[in-house]
């Protein structure tokens, strides 16, 4: 009961800090050493439901949903930087002892960002198909400073594009596109529904903030072991090369690639659980 009261207090504190809506919602289940699970772009924390079921008998799982995603109230820009700072505050206020960080996609990026910002505060990291610099995945020569002044990465223009998307057909069309990232049609529709329920401005601002933030040098400061679980980028060999290039400055990194699309927790759940289990032992 005392733990629950502390967590509720922390969430209330974060919601009032700087006069803003809280940067994320939190659902806490299980008992044991703490784990913070961060979902990917536009997703609800429910994307981790099955993973939490696997972990909750041994770990206390703090599952986040980022503000503006999947029906949660949005916050002002800079969104992801605010989320980073408030994850650190949340960990400190709740006196979580070196919580393990597990992130998917954008959530992996956030895990790397918070851990490199506060290196002594967090434990091991599990990055599920996420990179320190998304843009370099598509262009190895990408430069964050150049992208910031590139008209194609203008945040307000991207926001406008999202806001102009019609509601009619949004879920159906997005679900079709999501079949490139997950095998199951029901899962694809759920992911599409989370995106439909997300704040359009948040969708635009966060994808740009993610694209123009390069953490490849920052991760040198992370002292804890990092497990990177990748999906197939054209070929498994190419996946290992792409991931290895991005994490080459990490002090302790293990890279494994699944025979999977992007949502590994859905396409290769047992493989994911085994990898996490072995890494956390």
Predicted segment positions?
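Conserved hydrolase catalytic core segment
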Residues: 97-140
